[in-house]
Regions:
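Residue-level recognition of tetratricopeptide repeat
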Residues: 5, 35, 59-60, 91
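Start-of-helix register in tetratricopeptide repeats
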Residues: 28-32, 53, 60, 84, ...
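Terminal, low-structured helical/coil segments at or just beyond the last alpha-helical repeat
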Residues: 103-134
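Canonical tetratricopeptide repeat
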Residues: 2, 32, 57, 88, ...
């Protein structure tokens, strides 16, 4: 599986797929395949590959499939949420018109990573929100 991850990092997607196929029963293979399909732009297959995984990547696949309820549940279940987790929760909140959650999650993200403020200020996801004063 590690060979597949290295090949994927080097944008050798055919080689990555072959290596992942050889590691079909390896721990973490579903997560790796999910990332593979995300990079290929096959978001539906990515979401299926992640299965019940509770990770930022799994939530990203769900967001890109417009399954915001599943993405919210996944993000809430992430074991060690980080700035990206909260930023993604803010994206879900923006896409579901939950203004209070947008601000609450962006504040949590910015508390963990101050650069989030600058990112949110130019992110079209938050164009309808005043994120300048996080």
């Amino acid at each position: 599986m590690n060979l597949g991850l290295i090949k994927m990092m080097n944008k050798d997607y055919n080689g990555a797929r072959e290596a992942f196929g050889s590691a079909a029963n390896a721990e973490g293979i579903n997560e790796a395949m999910g990332v593979y399909y995300l990079r290929q732009g096959d978001y539906q297959t990515a979401a299926k590959a992640f299965g019940d995984s509770k990770s930022n990547n799994a939530a990203l696949a769900q967001i890109l499939n417009k399954d915001y309820s599943a993405a919210q549940s996944t993000l809430e279940a992430v074991r060690a949420p980080n700035a990206t987790t909260y930023y993604m929760m803010a994206v879900v909140a923006a896409r579901t018109n939950n203004e209070q959650a947008v601000y609450a999650n962006l504040r949590k993200a910015a508390a963990l990573d101050a650069s989030i403020k600058d990112r949110a200020a130019i992110d079209k996801e938050f164009a309808n929100y005043n994120v300048a004063n996080l």
